[in-house]
């Protein structure tokens, strides 16, 4: 029964999204509370820029949840990329003490995503090298570039991404979203990752603001959704990229 093929994953998706929607509602008050730190919504400050980006991200996540319930796999992929880029832009604004990119952003310029990847790479490796056990540079830039390119396939309608929109049952484009529901369920981790990245940026902001109370509160929210990854799994993932650099 073709209806069962579509309805079964749809039910699973709706049930699984309940946790994500609950987490979203826990994050939102923290985002809204940042407004107290802003005198004017047109001020050219880091906190105002980050507040605007967080606001957009929270609304984008709401749309992602709606699209996921409808089996809109392609559109979810495009919007997850948007959340990822906004997260990295927030990191760039926090890490770049000179406000160079912040001022360009307020002037209406588009900040290249590579600039954010470079800043995050340098920061994380600076922390990593403080560990006396660490001997190699972490391939942060390479990993983030790989992820960026994967999601770019959805944005730019690459053939590889559009193959996910082929309905193998009807041998047609996936107008009835049989494939869409299947790929939403299979790729559910990308929605989780978008929420995790949002929480990590909020934690980074609280650290920059020396707001320990809110840092601890958001860290507890993060623990509810953060996937468990073993040290060995992380090592195997990083090894793929360190080998490419050699």
Positions of the model-derived regions?
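A cross-kingdom marker of C-terminal helix-rich interaction/assembly modules
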Residues: 1-80, 90, 99-246
């Amino acid at each position: 029964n073709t209806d069962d093929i579509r309805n079964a994953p749809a039910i699973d998706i709706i049930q699984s999204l309940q946790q994500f929607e609950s987490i979203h509602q826990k994050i939102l008050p923290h985002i809204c509370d940042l407004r107290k730190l802003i005198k004017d919504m047109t001020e050219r400050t880091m906190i105002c820029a980050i507040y605007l980006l967080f606001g957009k991200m929270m609304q984008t996540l709401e749309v992602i949840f709606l699209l996921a319930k409808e089996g809109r796999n392609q559109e979810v992929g495009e919007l997850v990329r948007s959340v990822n880029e906004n997260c990295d832009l927030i990191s760039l604004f926090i890490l770049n003490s000179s406000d160079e990119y912040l001022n360009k952003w307020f002037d209406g310029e588009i900040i290249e995503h590579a600039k954010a990847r470079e800043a995050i790479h340098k920061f994380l490796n600076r922390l990593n090298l403080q560990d006396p056990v660490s001997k190699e540079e972490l391939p942060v830039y390479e990993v983030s570039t790989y992820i960026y390119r994967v999601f770019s396939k959805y944005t730019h309608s690459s053939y590889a991404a559009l193959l996910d929109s082929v309905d193998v049952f009807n041998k047609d484009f996936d107008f009835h979203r049989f494939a869409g529901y299947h790929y939403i369920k299979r790729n559910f981790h990308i929605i989780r990752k978008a929420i995790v990245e949002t929480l990590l940026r909020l934690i980074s902001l609280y650290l920059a603001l020396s707001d320990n109370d809110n840092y601890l509160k958001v860290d507890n929210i993060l623990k509810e959704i953060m996937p468990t990854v073993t040290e060995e799994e992380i090592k195997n993932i990083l090894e793929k990229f360190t080998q490419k650099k050699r």
